[in-house]
From Swiss-Prot:
<keyword id="KW-0547">Nucleotide-binding</keyword>
<dbReference type="GO" id="GO:0005737">
    <property type="term" value="C:cytoplasm"/>
</dbReference>
<protein>
    <recommendedName>
        <fullName>Urease accessory protein UreG</fullName>
    </recommendedName>
</protein>
<dbReference type="GO" id="GO:0003924">
    <property type="term" value="F:GTPase activity"/>
</dbReference>
<feature type="binding site">
    <location>
        <begin position="11"/>
        <end position="18"/>
    </location>
    <ligand>
        <name>GTP</name>
    </ligand>
</feature>
<dbReference type="InterPro" id="IPR003495">
    <property type="entry name" value="CobW/HypB/UreG_nucleotide-bd"/>
</dbReference>
<dbReference type="GO" id="GO:0043419">
    <property type="term" value="P:urea catabolic process"/>
</dbReference>
<dbReference type="InterPro" id="IPR004400">
    <property type="entry name" value="UreG"/>
</dbReference>
<keyword id="KW-0996">Nickel insertion</keyword>
<comment type="similarity">
    <text>Belongs to the SIMIBI class G3E GTPase family. UreG subfamily.</text>
</comment>
<comment type="function">
    <text>Facilitates the functional incorporation of the urease nickel metallocenter. This process requires GTP hydrolysis, probably effectuated by UreG.</text>
</comment>
<dbReference type="GO" id="GO:0016151">
    <property type="term" value="F:nickel cation binding"/>
</dbReference>
<dbReference type="GO" id="GO:0005525">
    <property type="term" value="F:GTP binding"/>
</dbReference>
<keyword id="KW-0342">GTP-binding</keyword>
<keyword id="KW-0963">Cytoplasm</keyword>
<keyword id="KW-0143">Chaperone</keyword>
<comment type="subunit">
    <text>Homodimer. UreD, UreF and UreG form a complex that acts as a GTP-hydrolysis-dependent molecular chaperone, activating the urease apoprotein by helping to assemble the nickel containing metallocenter of UreC. The UreE protein probably delivers the nickel.</text>
</comment>
Length: 201
């Protein structure tokens, strides 16, 4: 039996993907049956981080070592991730949500529709306020764009109003939000988005 929703979480290295997955697990685990697949190039660092953080029981977390280019494992040949998801769905037949966190990649990374139903794309303010206008599938076509680390804006000279204007121009009506996952600012919008996507929500 498959889970009700498979959610991809993608974005550049250090943008806050694992922090978002952890926050979603902690917020949703008491009301939903959850599991996570993480992707790293040569390690299982993100899976180990989630386990140490107590985000979920260890058996609900699978770490995939992609080798080479991380985008290949979520797009062109996602068989290793599909197998990990299928394994979790076999072990936990009542899963509501499986999150698949990609390895850190560039703005062109996107998930295969064979792997996930929806994608959240995470960027961070520390990379500069020009990132939204650079475009790419994650910026323009993700189901939800999360602009993380807003607390760093004054430290890196990023203008959040510029980021907001560029994001609205690049995304049109597609949803997006600002977050600071260190203190939970904006997390409620991400949680509400996820809950709204579940069947029979």
């Amino acid at each position: 039996m498959s889970s009700k929703l498979r959610l991809g979480v993608a974005g550049p290295v250090g943008s806050g993907k694992t922090a978002l997955v952890e926050a979603l697990c902690l917020r949703l685990r008491d009301q939903l049956q959850l599991a996570v697949v993480t992707n790293d190039i040569y390690t299982q660092e993100d899976a180990q981080f989630l386990t140490r953080a107590g985000a979920l029981e260890p058996e609900r977390i699978r770490g995939v070592e992609t080798g080479g280019c991380p985008h290949t494992a979520i797009r062109e040949d996602c068989s290793i991730n599909r197998a990990a998801v299928a394994d979790l769905e076999g072990q936990f037949p009542d899963l509501d949500l499986v999150m698949v966190e990609s390895g850190g990649d560039n703005l062109a990374a996107s998930f295969s529709p064979e792997l996930v139903d929806l994608c959240i794309y995470v960027i961070d303010v520390a990379a500069g306020d020009k990132i939204p206008r650079k475009g790419g599938p994650g910026i323009t076509r993700s189901d939800l764009l999360v602009i993380n680390k807003i607390d760093l804006a004054p430290l890196v000279g990023a203008d959040l109003s510029v980021m907001e204007a560029d994001t609205r121009r690049m995304r049109g009506e597609r949803p997006w939000c600002f977050t600071n996952l260190q203190n939970g600012d904006g997390l409620v919008q991400v949680v509400e988005f996820v809950l709204q996507q579940l069947p029979n929500a």
